[in-house]
Swiss-Prot record:
Gene name in the database record: gcvP
Keyword Ribonucleoprotein: no
Protein's recorded name: Glycine dehydrogenase (decarboxylating)
GO BP annotations, alphabetical order: glycine decarboxylation via glycine cleavage system
Functional summary from the UniProt entry: The glycine cleavage system catalyzes the degradation of glycine. The P protein binds the alpha-amino group of glycine through its pyridoxal phosphate cofactor; CO(2) is released and the remaining methylamine moiety is then transferred to the lipoamide cofactor of the H protein.
Length: 954
């Protein structure tokens, strides 16, 4: 049969992920956009935007880009190399059951996982309520007054507790005591944090080794890592008598049965909520918590959700006490924390809502009963259980049989914990089944059935909990799944995430989080691996981590990658510690000065302070560039003591600075190292490499450039890349290489989300990643071109171009019309948009970053909204609109405004359906403008009483 002459094969590639799925504008749309910007080709725009002196010469290449199906097959092949045995290792990581209604409707739901940190409260009411539930849960379980909305992991939370204790203690001591029964990774991270700050760390038995007068605080583990359940009340009283602070690392599941840290008198409680429905995932991500007494709440690190009111007086939630945080206080902040673990905290809070106090208590009781049954069988075999009282963990002396028993357990499909050279630890959880107990007994040489023993309890009677918890009605809702599903849906409908609209936040890179990238994170081969499982059970993880590290080295020009930092801020901290340890190894103990431009992100100076460095600010020029003359002067002035400089590239002003190589050369000439903040790496991938420019170390925000979703404020990943000379000083880990310097609880931070970044790289290929960078730059320049004339673009390069983001100056509107940047941001909500980054790095401005994933239609819709807002401001200037009663000042408008009594001098239609807003699928804010001052002056950080919910519904 002959082929008809009119039939032609198409070259269209339906599964070309990079160009058909990830990159928003079509080729035809790009041509239109380039004309608007003033260029004939994308390469012409890049040549005019990126200095030739920094552009990489060789293209970024690593094999053929895969389709979604091919990448998923590759991920499946890799995942199958992992062995998801039943891990009873414990040590802060436990098996748990994620209720399917939570997995499907939160963890796998883009309405939850693509949202940003809730800085704009009006469009974040759903997750703010879920986080308030989390805080209420933690306060109830710990018996303390105020809890934050999550921290990165238990070990870093412990380090934060130590730092907080030093801030608030009246004791003048410079040492911190750590219970030797704390988890080893917790002790290691505390030691890392303390060393550059000059604090001593004393590790020992608190009942024999603690001298309260010689420390500013102490941390106790409850229950201990080896299972001990102890009453710390006398020790806490002794610490208070010495004006020191008491912190307790507590397992929230155990607190359902045990006396709370607050009832013992503790000032601070920290821990992990992982076993509340969040898989172990080879170490993370998980939501840690911190709760404190009311008197010291203003020194607490991390996000804090509080209750306020909106302009109508209705209840509304917001982030409270933000003046404590790094983006405002910089090196004087309580911490460098930026990203937390919001998505995981939401899951944990919903786990509590799903089960209620009765269900949670039943789970805790069952875990304890199974542990008692296990202990009875082992005792019958002649083994002595080390802690007489325990919750879920027991430790046994087995002598020379340790290796034999551990191997026998693995043969039974069970991992046990190796403790020293002669002991074994066993920790049970809600996934432990009768068959698991029988398998463990067989590994120890027994042949029992669960029915051979009668359960009882082995908790100390004096520590049994009698106080109530989770009394708020939200934890007593109807358990029907239909109700749970609808509650989750109601909350998500109050929020604005990427599933509804572009989120053009500058310096945040809110790009597509493709479904194909997300799918593998819930596969048990990735989600059910314990971080301290034998290495031969995680070969798939190691293959993925190694390959992703190689790709990141190719992208950055560095020689080695550490995956341990589990946020961008942690990456900064780890990178600076790497530099510090490099200088110390050379004997240059005096090199402690860090030069940082005044325009830097607040985490930079906060991280430098944590690393024991003296921050010396460097001026910025009027065009936003680093003042090279001032930089040279400061480098010469501090030459002897210069440790490093921290710069962001492209700059925080959204421009490729021409002098970046000179900055690196000056720093090196004075013996310093260069830390190049990778926050803006989305403008460099495939075009320029930090390691080629002269940088020595960078962190990469995988939750920005490499597609891990922001999760409403976490999780994130901040791996660091370094040049070869810094490789020996990368973070170590007590459970892997035994080296010091750990910055996170798990060796690879939050590895269960690494499949997202890896699959992104596989599906894009080097060519696709390069194209994504170019289109990100095009999209930003297109917005800048369209808005020029209505607004001033504050900073551009010598060629008049911006990088991947642009800063729009709204300050003239305040002078001419009384319209603030806040008014513009809230009016964008009426148009169905999350506002760009407000007042950073310049007060009164908006920083816009569209990313490569947004289509021309969405960019045009945003520009239409911004231009319409400018026209509304012009109407105020011309006297056609009232200066105080107008759509900008009253934004955002709600359904209650629309259907209620209308007495405003503009129409309902103008209020609620401005240009850019969808008429059919319009997003409605659930509250009017939130009163920030009221929220901080009347701080409430737990769920309001049910009467307020009833009143709001009337």
């Amino acid at each position: 049969m002959t082929t008809p002459t009119e039939f032609q094969f198409t070259d269209y590639q339906p599964y070309d992920f990079a160009n058909r799925r990830h990159i928003g504008p079509s080729p035809a749309e790009m041509d239109e956009m380039l004309k608007t910007v003033g260029y004939d080709s994308l390469d012409g725009l890049i040549a005019a935007t990126v200095p030739a002196s920094i552009r990489q010469s060789a293209p970024l290449v690593w094999g053929k880009a895969m389709s979604e199906r091919e990448a998923l097959d590759k991920l499946r092949e890799t995942a199958n190399k992992n062995k998801a045995l039943t891990s009873l290792i414990g040590q802060g990581y436990y098996g748990t059951i994620t209720p399917p209604v939570i997995q499907r409707n939160i963890l796998e739901n883009p309405a939850w996982y693509t949202a940003y940190t809730p800085y704009q409260p009006e469009i974040s009411q759903g997750r703010l309520e879920a986080l308030l539930n989390f805080q209420t849960m933690i306060c109830d379980l710990t018996g303390l007054d105020v809890a934050n909305a999550s921290l990165l992991d238990e070990a870093t939370a412990a380090a934060e507790a130590m730092a907080m204790a030093e801030r608030v203690a009246k004791s003048k001591a410079k040492a911190f005591f750590v219970d030797s029964n704390c988890h080893p990774q917790t002790i290691a991270v505390i030691q890392t944090r303390a060393e550059p700050l000059g604090w001593g760390v004393v590790v020992g038995n608190p009942f024999t080794d603690l001298n309260p007068g010689e420390v500013f605080g102490a941390l106790f583990q409850y229950p201990g890592t080896h299972g001990h359940v102890s009453d710390f009340t006398p020790l806490i009283n002794a610490l208070h008598n010495a004006q020191a602070i008491a912190a307790v690392a507590a397992d929230p599941l155990a607190l359902l049965l045990l006396k709370s840290p607050g009832e013992m008198g503790a000032d601070i409680a920290i821990g992990s909520s992982q076993r509340f429905g969040v898989p172990v995932g080879y170490g993370g991500p998980h939501a840690a918590y911190m709760a404190v007494k009311d008197a010291i709440k203003r020194s607490m690190p991390g996000r804090l959700v509080g209750v306020s009111v909106d302009s109508r007086g209705n209840r509304a939630y917001r982030l409270s006490l933000q003046t404590r945080e790094q983006h405002i206080r910089r090196e004087k902040a309580t911490s460098n924390i930026c990203t937390a673990q919001v998505l995981l905290a939401v899951m944990a809070s919903m786990y509590a809502v799903f089960h209620g106090p009765q269900g949670l208590k039943a789970i805790a009781q069952q875990v304890h009963q199974k542990t008692v049954l296990l202990a009875k069988g082992l005792e019958k075999l002649g083994f002595t259980i080390e802690p007489e009282t325990f919750f879920d963990t027991i430790t046994l002396e087995v002598g020379h049989m340790q290796g034999l028993i551990l191997r026998a357990a693995v043969a039974e499909g069970v991992n046990l914990r190796k403790v020293g050279t002669t002991k074994i630890g066993i920790s049970l959880d809600e996934r432990t089944r009768p068959a698991t107990l029988e398998a463990v007994w067989r590994a120890f040489g027994g042949n029992f059935a669960v029915g051979d023993f009668t359960p009882d309890y082995r908790l100390p009677t004096s520590l049994l909990r009698t106080s109530q918890y989770l009394t708020h009605p939200i934890f007593h809702m109807n358990r029907a799944e239909s109700e749970m599903t609808r509650y989750i849906r109601r909350l998500s409908d109050r929020d604005l995430a990427l599933d509804r609209a572009m989120i053009p936040l500058g310096s945040c890179t809110m790009k597509l989080n493709a479904t194909a990238e997300m799918l593998p994170i819930t596969w048990p081969e990735f989600s059910d691996i314990h971080p301290f499982a034998p290495a031969d059970q995680a070969l798939g993880y190691q293959e993925m981590i190694d390959d992703l590290s190689e790709k990141l080295c190719a992208v950055t020009g560095y020689d080695a990658i550490s995956m341990q930092p589990n946020s961008g801020a942690q990456g900064e901290y780890a990178g600076l510690l790497t530099i510090r340890n490099y200088h110390l190894a050379k004997g240059d103990t005096h090199r402690t000065v860090c030069l940082i431009p005044t325009s830097a992100h607040g985490t930079n100076p906060a991280s430098a302070q944590m690393a024991g460095m003296l921050v010396v600010p460097v001026k910025a020029l009027d065009n936003g560039d680093v003042d090279l003359a001032d930089f040279r002067t400061k480098a010469e002035q501090h030459s002897t003591n210069l440790s490093c400089c921290m710069i962001t590239y492209p700059s925080t002003h959204g421009v490729f600075e021409e002098t970046v190589r000179e900055i690196c050369e000056i720093t090196h000439a004075h013996g310093g190292q260069v830390y190049l903040d990778g926050a803006n790496m989305n403008a460099m991938v495939g075009i320029a490499r930090p390691g080629d420019i002269g940088s020595d170390v960078s962190h990469l925000n995988l939750h920005k450039t490499f597609c891990i979703p922001h999760g409403g404020g976490g999780p994130g990943m901040g791996p660091i890349g370094v040049k070869a000379h810094l490789t020996p000083y990368l973070p170590g880990h007590v459970e892997t290489d035994g080296r010091p310097g750990a910055v996170s609880a798990a060796p690879y931070g939050s590895p269960s989300i690494l499949p997202i970044s890896w699959s992104y790289c596989l599906m894009m290929g080097g060519e696709g990643l390069t194209q994504a960078t170019k289109v990100a730059i095009l999209n930003a320049n297109y917005i800048a071109a369209r808005l020029t004339g209505a607004y001033d673009v504050l900073y551009t390069s010598a060629s008049g171009r911006v990088a991947h983001e642009c800063i729009i100056d709204t300050r003239p509107l305040a002078d001419s019309a009384g319209v603030t940047v806040d008014d513009v941001a809230k009016r964008l909500i009426d148009c169905g948009f999350h506002a760009p980054t407000m007042s950073w790095p310049v007060a009164g401005t908006l920083m816009i970053e569209p990313t490569e994933s947004e289509t021309k239609a969405e960019l045009d819709r945003f520009c239409t909204a911004m231009l319409a807002i400018r026209e509304e401001a012009r109407a105020i200037e011309d006297g056609r609109m009232d200066k105080t009663n107008n759509p900008l000042k009253n934004a955002p408008h709600t359904v209650e405004d629309l259907v209620g009594e209308w007495d405003r001098p503009y129409s309902r239609d103008q209020a609620c359906y401005p240009p850019g807003a969808f008429r059919v699928d319009k997003y409605w804010s659930s509250v009017n403008r939130v009163d920030n001052v009221y929220g901080d002056r009347n701080l409430v950080c737990t769920c309001p009483p049910m009467s307020e919910y009833a009143e709001a519904a009337e």
